[in-house]
Amino acid sequence: MSLHENHATLATAQAGAHSQWRARLELGFVREGERTTLKHRLHDGPLRVQRPLYPEGYGVCHAVIVHPPGGIAGGDQLAIDVDVGAGAHAVIATPGATKWYKSNGRAAQQCVGVRVGAGGKLDWLPQNNIVFDQANAKLDFSLMLGDGATALGWDATQLGRQAAGERWSEGSLHAVSRIVGADGELLWFERASLAANDSLREAAQGLDGFSAYGTLWAVGAACDDALAEALTAQLGFDESIRAAASCVTSGVLVVRAVSRSMEMLQKALTRCWVQLRPVVHGVQGVPLRIWAT
């Protein structure tokens, strides 16, 4: 499996600066008969995976990634590498929101790389990001798919601690997401670069004043314009939430949403996932138990 940094570099960083964390987590899922097994796990620093669960039967392995510090501060660097082998099906989630703390001028970074082998299936379902005031966050997500692999996933972000009445008035957010097909073709690429004082936050062609936004992506042969239109017809478009689906290329569907409430946005994305899962993976969409805790 690919490594973002070697052990010596990580150890030196942690020993030399206790105020920042560098952490890496590797996960490898394989298909063994009728069972998907978490065969490989390796961690450095404060990233862990809980004991694998099988609420859908042994063919689908659920793994929950935890970050014990509870948030990502300035200077922190987190790297997550996931390999889902041929024919395996992995569901990967987090137990709570990822908090991006005040950075004191230093950027915090999270890099995620996921590979899904031929005929494999992935559900990438982390809970949302919360960007604190004065946070400077960098996020990088890459998904590489083998022949016949299918994938469903999302990413959602709340700017400012809305529940605490805090606005995101200073800081920056840079995010890159890419999905690459079996032949190396770039299926979807998105780059977002946003400063707290950026006029796009209020502009109609930007966030239009909404503080929460998210994207759900689906990759599979069934993802087409008709499916996108059917989803859009069921999504809200008013002063509380605005959402729509589109087929960005053959076999790739994207749902985008903005909302004044992260709870409302997450519910909308969850409904989409429940509807899409049987179509994309051929598996019933049942909300994860961890979402109810």
Swiss-Prot record:
Top-rank taxon: Bacteria
What keywords are annotated for this sequence in UniProt?
Chaperone, Cytoplasm, Nickel insertion
Task: Kindly state one GO CC term assigned in the UniProt record.
Answer: cytoplasm
Coiled-coil intervals, chain numbering: none
Q: Does the keyword Ubl conjugation apply?
A: no
Subcellular localization(s) per the UniProt record: Cytoplasm
Query: Record keywords: Manganese included?
Result: no
Q: What is its main location?
A: cytoplasm
Q: Name one GO molecular function term.
A: nickel cation binding
InterPro entries per the record? UreD
| Subunit details | UreD, UreF and UreG form a complex that acts as a GTP-hydrolysis-dependent molecular chaperone, activating the urease apoprotein by helping to assemble the nickel containing metallocenter of UreC. The UreE protein probably delivers the nickel.
Query: Its function?
Result: Required for maturation of urease via the functional incorporation of the urease nickel metallocenter.
Q: Which protein family is it in?
A: Belongs to the UreD family.
Query: Under which name does UniProt file this protein?
Result: Urease accessory protein UreD
What species was this sequence derived from?
Answer: Paraburkholderia xenovorans (strain LB400)
State the encoding gene: ureD
